[in-house]
Design a protein with these regions (language model features):
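Signature of N6-adenine DNA methyltransferases within the class I
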Residues: 4, 8-26, 34-72, 80-178
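Nucleotide donor/acceptor-binding cores
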Residues: 31
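Conserved residues in the N-terminal Rossmann fold of short-chain dehydrogenase/reductase
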Residues: 77
Length: 178
């Protein structure tokens, strides 16, 4: 495994069933669905794979992809952030990795700095990168449902991300589980 991906072994945060069910209910049926950090498939448990024309899931861990047993799913053993994707999605559901970019390799940080100009420098979290990349793959009338820490709502380092989200009118609803 690449050196910069070793840090991802420390950031597994699984989605509770109750939240996964709520998230899946917010998606619209049909079209293409993306899950960019599938992990053990918690977010897919409440999704009928036959309700979608195509489902793509990504993870860097083969052991997680091996646990996904639903039909009609394209499994990609790849780093979602660094993978070029030439399609757009009607639905995106995600629980991205939560890891400070400063804890990643210098090469990985440089890749992010070069390819994600919407981010400020400083204490940036990898989940910011996942949000931006997912939004770039979302169709204009698409739905993205994400569970994240609420830190991007107030962290100084997330100012550029907040402006990006608000300027492009990406936020329809926020549910805060404090």
């Amino acid at each position: 495994m690449d050196e910069h991906l070793l840090q991802f072994n420390k950031c597994d945060v699984f989605t509770p069933s109750k939240i996964a069910q709520l998230m899946s209910e917010k998606l619209k049926k049909g079209g293409k669905l993306l899950e960019p950090a599938v992990g053990t498939g918690d977010l897919l448990k409440f999704i009928n794979s036959h309700d979608y024309d195509e489902i793509d899931v990504y993870d860097i861990k083969e052991k997680y992809l091996a646990t996904i047993e639903k039909e009609n799913i394209n499994k990609h053993l790849a780093d979602f952030v660094q993978t070029e994707i030439d399609k757009s999605y009607d639905n995106i559901i995600l629980n991205p990795p939560y890891i400070r970019i400063q804890d990643l390799s210098p090469e990985y940080r440089e890749y992010i700095k070069t390819n994600f100009s919407q981010l400020e420098h400083g204490l940036v979290d990898l989940y910011y990168v996942f949000l931006i990349k997912c939004l770039s793959l979302l169709k204009e009338d698409g739905i993205m449902v994400a569970i994240t820490p609420n830190s991007y709502l107030y962290n100084k380092s997330a100012l550029a991300l907040r402006k990006y989200l608000l300027t492009n009118k990406y936020i329809e609803e926020i549910i805060d589980y404090q």
